[in-house]
Design a protein with these regions (language model features):
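Active-/binding-site microenvironments in catalytic and ligand-binding cores
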Residues: 1-280
Length: 280
C-alpha cells in the first residue's frame, strides 16, 4: 500500500474506518473503580513528578522539571485483560495437578491473530439476578444452541463475546462493590453469569479459540476453577472485563484486543475495540 492509498485512496484504511466506526469496549482503570480482582494487588496511580515544586499534589517524589509523570501499580489481570494458559496451567515438569505443556505459554506468546476476528455476541442478559448470594448462574450449551437457532451456527475463527450485562455494576466505589467484591468476598450479592465447563467444551467443538465476557471472570463467583481449566488447558484465550457489548449486533462486528507485551505475564491488560458497520 502506498502513501496515497493509506491516506485516503479508494479502498483505503481511511475508507474502512469511515464505514466501520470504532467502539471502545474497555473499562476504566482507577483507584475508585473495581478493576482488580478482590484480594489481589489493587490498582494504584500516584504522581511522581509535577510541573513545579510549588503547589504540587501529594505524593510527589521527584522534581524532574516542568512535566507531569505518574506511576501505576497493577497486576497482570487488572481491568480488561487476556488470560494466558499459564494463569491456571502449571508447567509440565512441576508435578502439580493440571500441569501441561501449555503451562509455559505466557501472555507474550499469545498470537495477536487469536485476539481479533469477527464477533459472535451471545446475549444472556436474562440471567442477571438469577444467581444466589455468592453464586453465579450458569451459561449452558442450551443458551448457545438457542442463540444459534436465531443467528446460525457458531463458526470456527469467530470470537464469542458473552453479553451478560454485568458491566452495569462496573461503577466507582462504593456502588462498585456489586461488581466482584460482594459476590466473591462478602457473599452478600449474586454472582455474574458464567459459562459452565460444558458450554466451553461446546464452543471449542465449534472451533472457537477466543472467548470474551463483560464480567470480572470467565469463572463463576462460586467456581473459578472448572471454567478456566476447561478452556486454558486446550489453548483457549479468555478476555475478561469487557464493557459495552450492547453496542454490537449479534453478528457483523469485528473485535480487536491488543494486550501489553509483558515478559512472563500470566495475563495481559490492554484495550479492546469493536468495529461495527455504520448504519445507512
Amino acid at each position: 500500500m502506498d502513501q496515497r492509498e493509506a491516506a485516503g485512496g479508494a479502498g483505503s484504511i481511511a475508507d474502512v474506518l469511515a464505514e466501520y466506526p470504532v467502539i471502545d469496549l474497555t473499562v476504566t482503570n482507577g483507584e475508585r473503580w473495581p478493576c482488580w480482582w478482590p484480594m489481589q494487588m489493587p490498582f494504584q496511580q500516584k504522581v511522581w513528578n509535577w510541573f513545579a515544586e510549588s503547589g504540587a499534589p501529594a505524593p510527589v517524589h521527584a522534581y524532574m522539571g516542568p512535566v507531569q509523570v505518574r506511576w501505576i501499580t497493577l497486576d497482570d489481570h487488572c481491568g480488561i485483560h487476556v488470560d494466558a494458559p499459564s494463569h491456571f496451567v502449571p508447567p509440565a515438569d512441576s508435578g502439580l495437578p493440571h500441569a501441561g505443556l501449555l503451562g509455559r505459554q505466557t501472555g507474550v506468546q499469545i498470537s495477536l491473530t487469536d485476539l481479533m476476528g469477527p464477533a459472535a455476541v451471545v446475549d444472556v442478559t436474562e440471567l442477571i439476578g438469577a444467581g444466589g448470594p455468592g453464586v453465579s448462574p450458569w451459561i449452558t450449551p442450551d443458551h448457545l444452541r438457542a442463540w444459534e437457532a436465531r443467528q446460525g451456527p457458531l463458526r470456527s475463527g469467530e470470537i464469542v463475546l458473552l453479553h451478560t450485562g454485568w458491566d452495569r455494576y462496573y461503577q466507582p466505589w462504593p456502588a462498585g462493590r456489586a461488581y466482584a467484591f460482594d459476590p466473591v468476598v462478602t457473599r452478600a450479592g449474586p454472582g455474574w453469569p458464567a459459562p459452565r465447563a460444558a458450554a466451553i467444551d461446546y464452543m471449542r467443538g465449534r472451533g472457537i479459540t477466543t472467548l470474551g465476557i463483560d464480567a470480572p471472570s470467565i469463572g463463576a463467583a462460586h467456581d473459578a476453577l472448572s471454567p478456566h481449566y476447561t478452556g486454558l488447558e486446550h489453548g483457549m484465550r479468555y478476555v475478561e472485563n469487557l464493557s459495552g457489548l450492547d453496542q454490537l449486533a449479534p453478528r457483523g462486528a469485528y473485535f480487536i484486543f491488543l494486550p501489553l507485551k509483558v515478559e512472563g505475564a500470566s495475563g495481559c491488560p490492554g484495550r479492546a475495540i469493536g468495529m461495527r458497520r455504520r448504519r445507512a
